[in-house]
């Protein structure tokens, strides 16, 4: 009896020691190995290109024409070695008879629960010496820390995405704030239960009326003018509106002509406190061109734009076009002067003024009568009114 072979070449699995791929996620990991073991079958598959001709040469003679069609009829067994389609017949043929199989409810429920799960054969080697199952793409966009789609100045970016990016940039500040909050909370818990009278005796501070903390603002990276501006806005909110209160309770009597119907309070103002939600802290600097640095060229462009805008501004009142210091034309002309001018024009018209006319066949008496008629018409019309 011969010795048993240590390795059966027919059933053995061959591996090759190769360098780890650059697309492997563990390529830059110091703890990972530089070389990995890859099966010879996978190397052969990746080395040669699969096309229709090679597939026909390898599997064309062994594959049946109806192989794999049994799954369309509910037969999920492996039909590579046995043809299950030979037992099926089309309904309606002479040599076929329909026999309904008795199916119980339990078997139907089991069939619904059964699902096909394809699992790869587990490897006999540890995962540390094998390449990663997922490989990364080595394209330009995939190697960037921030993709071009969300990088740069984008005023139309989704505000929710902008808020997340801002929080990621200031992650250190948030960590410090949370640590300070935890310390204050621990001190508050250690102090014990508070007295109700002391709690209600504290001054009530509405949302947005906290005392301004310059240290926290400086830690957030704000400039001096931003800090001063926020302090000014906070003090402006705290001051009561004296003008509005005096106007509502004025003791001066008003006439009925000045009575006006007051405006109704809109529902949006009354519900502003109830609808208030967590929002991002908006800065006092806008993202428009007015917040950018203005050099001489941009300043000149702004002046030209303002001038063009004034030309296209609609005139609300036509009286603005009239100069109040300018005298009216009708005030400069007297009625007697106007009548003298008209008489002189009618008498001298024809031979000396205007275009040349054909010689008039009207006698002097008729001309005098026509002038007299014109004078009569004037007298009947009365004095000219302008």
From Swiss-Prot:
Any single biological process term in GO: ribosomal small subunit export from nucleus
InterPro entries in alphabetical order: Ltv1
Keywords: Cytoplasm, Nucleus, Phosphoprotein, Protein transport, Transport
Main location: nucleus
DNA damage is among the record's keywords: no
Location of this chain's protein in the cell: Nucleus; Cytoplasm
Phosphoserine carried by residues: 171, 179, 244-245, 286
Stretches with biased composition (Basic residues): 270-279, 354-368
Region described as Disordered: 103-126, 198-219, 236-287, 353-374
Compositional bias annotation for Acidic residues: 248-262
UniProt cross-references to Pfam families, sorted A to Z: LTV
One GO CC term, this protein: cytosol
Cleaved signal peptide residues: none
Family: Belongs to the LTV1 family.
Biological role stated in the UniProt entry: Involved in protein transport. Non-ribosomal factor required for efficient nuclear export of the ribosomal 40S subunit. May participate in intracellular sorting of GAP1 out of the endosome.
Name of the molecule in the record: Protein LTV1
Source organism of the structure: Schizosaccharomyces pombe (strain 972 / ATCC 24843)
